[in-house]
Amino acid sequence: MTAIQNFFKTFFLTELLKGLALTGRYTFQRKVTVQFPEEKTPISPRFRGLHALRRYENGEERCIACKLCEAVCPALAITIESETRADNTRRTTRYDIDLTKCIFCGFCEESCPVDSIVETHILEYHGEKRGDLYFTKDMLLAVGDRYETEIAANKAADAPYR
């Protein structure tokens, strides 16, 4: 009996007609698709995108070379080298993040005691070569300087949940 039913379903194209009816029903309804490059959807305040290093208001970089972010990184994407200055404070001489290894978990941001390393809302970045996704200290500081107002606003919005 089922073989005969299957024959008539396929012979009279009932599945095809059901699919066309469904398509026709949704053709004239409001669209939910976003045309991405031209339209942007709202981003969560907790979105984790491109990394940035922040500075204090006086221009000095925040990183104290505690290396907690390097230790907590599960992907081993962060490399830090530091030196002790004349006033017995440590500062980084090298701070590199390999974004080809990074899984954007946010552990580096959570472990930083001085809020030096942050993940911004920047999601549109690319590289033509693998080396283009290897961010050095100067590149990370440049991102932080450029987007400091946005970073500070996002930190303030997220403050009640931290």
UniProtKB/Swiss-Prot annotation:
Residues binding [4Fe-4S] cluster 2: 73, 102, 105, 108
Binding-site residues for [4Fe-4S] cluster 1, renumbered to this chain: 63, 66, 69, 112
Residues spanning the membrane: none
GO biological process terms, semicolon-separated: aerobic respiration
Main location: membrane
Keyword presence, Secreted: no
Residue span, 4Fe-4S ferredoxin-type domain: 54-83, 93-122
Coiled coil: none
Keyword vocabulary terms for this entry: 4Fe-4S, Cell inner membrane, Cell membrane, Iron, Iron-sulfur, Membrane, Metal-binding, NAD, Quinone, Repeat, Translocase, Ubiquinone
Enzyme class: translocase
Membrane-topology annotation of the record: Peripheral membrane protein
Cofactor binding annotation: Binds 2 [4Fe-4S] clusters per subunit.
Subcellular location: Cell inner membrane
A cellular component annotation (GO) from this entry: plasma membrane
EC number from the UniProt entry: 7.1.1.-
Cofactor (UniProt): [4Fe-4S] cluster
PROSITE patterns linked: 4FE4S_FER_1, 4FE4S_FER_2
Molecular function in Gene Ontology: 4 iron, 4 sulfur cluster binding; iron ion binding; NADH:ubiquinone reductase (non-electrogenic) activity; quinone binding
Catalytic activity: a quinone + NADH + 5 H(+)(in) = a quinol + NAD(+) + 4 H(+)(out)
HAMAP family: NDH1_NuoI
Protein role: NDH-1 shuttles electrons from NADH, via FMN and iron-sulfur (Fe-S) centers, to quinones in the respiratory chain. The immediate electron acceptor for the enzyme in this species is believed to be ubiquinone. Couples the redox reaction to proton translocation (for every two electrons transferred, four hydrogen ions are translocated across the cytoplasmic membrane), and thus conserves the redox energy in a proton gradient.
Protein family per UniProt: Belongs to the complex I 23 kDa subunit family.
Subunit annotation: NDH-1 is composed of 14 different subunits. Subunits NuoA, H, J, K, L, M, N constitute the membrane sector of the complex.
Protein name: NADH-quinone oxidoreductase subunit I
